[in-house]
């Protein structure tokens, strides 16, 4: 038996070893061959098996029941003990603890305060005074009321004379947690051809009339700025109010010139960003305010005489390109034959100073020259201040106008404009200019911000367009302008008033009693010239066919040169 067991064990071992080797050679085939090999037919076995059977009655074998055992459990309780040791440390007097460095406070700047009133009522905004020591470029804020619908607003408007690429700074907002933050960013814009382009505007859709607040670049110059206490009566829910600072306490010395933040064009032909002649669609509200009579006359330095004082001139073709020198010389010279004594120029682009200056000198005209502030703000206009200072033909200049409806258009606030006028005046005076400097805005802006502007303006400059008052017909245009001038005389007591832009369109759509047309234009122009011609600059020499039609479709059709005999 032992031999059989050993033989059987040996056979199984051999089969297992063979299976392992087979599995290594053929893998899955070994799973079908796990059995002992058959013995050969003629082999003999050396073992004999005997079976012994015993017969007898069945016997029950009792199974003993297990003896139950008793298990005793013991409760175990674990006790936790905590010991505390108190150590008192006395600091040495020779090693005092270092005091933390005080945090640097941010210098407050007179940016407009924006307040949202969720419900109707009367609210009081407390007064605030801020003193600024350094010139700083910041994101200001402006508002515009949009009627229901889709509108595009803001952005930077630039005029280029040829295809070019410009690198342009613009103001925008970025999300910051649950709010938004106004920032100045820069973009590269390809202008495919000559023309006027608006870069990075914002488009929005409003379901109802809504006041939109959006950022604009602004330069804060040194000085003391006051935000007076304001009482606001809110007549509708969710109303947004912008409370600007005013520079009532101007610095005794001239503030530093604002830093220029505009990035120049990336091509050698850098585009002018301030070449667009102003639109005239600003509605001038009528007023019934009683104004004291004034005996002041036009300033002697302007050379104003009876009849018509001046006319605006922009050196652009019908397509918006720059005119050649010969055209400018002949057209400006013709103003003298019409009885004008002044020509008003808005900007320095298209060689305006050189060409118009030469024509003015030859013809015996005086110039009212301008620094045009566009949507780039005052920083984008600094180059014009430099250009005028270098040109410096002051014997031709009777007045410099810094900005044309810049506040009305939302390009800067009153305090920013006042600071820029002050710094520009200093630059002109340093270059030898001894004449007068002002700005020009509609009457409503002067009424709202006269306290800020009067101190830096030598005269009150206003754009008075009777056509945009729906109750004024062409034959009443002169009386309307005269009434507005009287109101303006009361805003800056002791300072003269000039109507720096006025006229009447000869085509377009009616605005109530104000009807455009060739005959209506002639009637309105004569009415204005008869009433206040010696204090008025007429708009404009030619039609500006390169403009958009604008409100009432009249923006292109203000040319009135041929109306004068």
UniProtKB/Swiss-Prot annotation:
Comp. bias intervals (Low complexity): 251-304
Signal among keywords: yes
Q: Which UniProt keywords apply?
A: Carbohydrate metabolism, Cell wall, Cellulose degradation, Glycosidase, Hydrolase, Polysaccharide degradation, Secreted, Signal
Reported EC number(s) for this entry are 3.2.1.21
Gene Ontology biological process terms from the UniProt entry:
cell wall organization; cellulose catabolic process
Annotated pathway: Glycan metabolism; cellulose degradation
What reactions does this protein catalyze?
Hydrolysis of terminal, non-reducing beta-D-glucosyl residues with release of beta-D-glucose
What compartments host this protein?
Answer: Secreted, Cell wall
**Signal sequence segment:** 1-18
Top-level taxon of origin: Eukaryota
Q: Which SUPFAM superfamilies match?
A: (Trans)glycosidases
- What's one GO-annotated cellular component? cell surface
List the active site: 405 (proton donor), 501 (nucleophile)
Q: Which family does it belong to?
A: Belongs to the glycosyl hydrolase 17 family.
Q: What protein is this chain from? A: Probable beta-glucosidase btgE
Give the organism, scientific name.
Aspergillus fumigatus (strain ATCC MYA-4609 / CBS 101355 / FGSC A1100 / Af293)
């Amino acid at each position: 038996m032992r031999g059989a067991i050993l033989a059987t064990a040996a056979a199984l071992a051999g089969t297992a070893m063979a299976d392992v080797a087979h599995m290594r050679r053929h893998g899955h085939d070994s799973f079908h061959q796990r059995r002992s090999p058959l013995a050969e037919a003629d082999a003999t076995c050396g073992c004999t098996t005997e079976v012994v059977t015993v017969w007898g009655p069945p016997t029950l074998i009792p199974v003993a029941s297990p003896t139950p055992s008793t298990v005793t459990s013991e409760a175990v309780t674990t006790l936790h003990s905590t010991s505390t040791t108190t150590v008192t440390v006395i600091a040495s007097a020779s090693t005092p603890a270092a005091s933390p460095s005080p945090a640097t406070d941010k210098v407050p700047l007179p940016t407009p305060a924006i307040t949202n009133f969720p419900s109707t009522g009367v609210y009081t905004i407390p007064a605030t005074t801020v003193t600024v020591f350094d010139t700083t470029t910041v994101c200001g804020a402006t508002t515009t009321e949009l009627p229901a619908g889709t509108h595009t607003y803001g952005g930077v408007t630039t005029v280029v004379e040829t295809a070019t690429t410009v690198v342009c700074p613009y103001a925008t907002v970025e999300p910051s947690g649950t709010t938004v933050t106004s920032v100045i960013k820069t973009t590269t814009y390809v202008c495919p051809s000559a023309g006027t382009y608006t870069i990075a505007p914002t488009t929005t859709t409003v379901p109802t009339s809504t006041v939109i607040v959006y950022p604009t670049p602004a330069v804060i110059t040194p000085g003391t700025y006051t935000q007076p206490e304001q009482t606001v009566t809110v007549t509708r829910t969710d109303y947004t109010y912008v409370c600007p600072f005013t520079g009532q306490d101007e610095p005794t010395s001239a503030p530093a010139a604002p830093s220029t933040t505009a990035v120049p064009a990336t091509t050698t032909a850098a585009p002018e960003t301030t070449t667009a002649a102003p639109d005239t669609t600003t509605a001038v509200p009528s007023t019934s305010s009683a104004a004291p009579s004034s005996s002041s006359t036009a300033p002697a330095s302007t050379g104003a005489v009876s009849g018509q004082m001046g006319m605006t001139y922009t050196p652009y073709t019908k397509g918006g390109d720059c005119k050649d020198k010969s055209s400018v010389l002949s057209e400006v010279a013709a103003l003298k034959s019409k009885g004008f004594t002044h020509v008003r120029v808005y900007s320095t682009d298209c060689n305006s100073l050189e060409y118009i200056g030469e024509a003015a000198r030859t013809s015996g005209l005086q110039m009212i020259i301008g620094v045009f502030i566009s949507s780039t703000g005052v920083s984008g206009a600094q180059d014009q201040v430099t250009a005028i200072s270098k040109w410096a033909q002051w014997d031709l200049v009777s007045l410099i106008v810094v900005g044309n409806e810049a506040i009305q258009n939302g390009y800067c606030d009153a305090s920013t404009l006042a600071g820029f006028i002050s710094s520009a005046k200093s630059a002109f005076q340093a270059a030898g200019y001894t004449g007068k400097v002002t700005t020009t805005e509609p009457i409503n802006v002067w009424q709202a911000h006269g306290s800020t502007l009067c101190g830096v303006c030598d005269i009150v400059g206003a754009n008075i367009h009777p056509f945009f008052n729906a109750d004024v017909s062409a034959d009443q245009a002169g009386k309307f302008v005269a009434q507005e001038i009287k109101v303006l005389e009361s805003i800056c007591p002791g300072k003269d008033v000039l109507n720096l832009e006025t006229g009447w369109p000869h085509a377009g759509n009616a605005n109530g009693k104000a009807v455009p047309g060739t005959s209506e234009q002639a009637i309105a122009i004569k009415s204005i010239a008869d009433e206040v011609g010696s204090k008025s600059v007429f708009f404009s020499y030619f039609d500006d066919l390169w403009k958009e039609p604008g409100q009432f479709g009249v923006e292109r059709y203000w040319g009135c040169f041929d109306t004068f005999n």
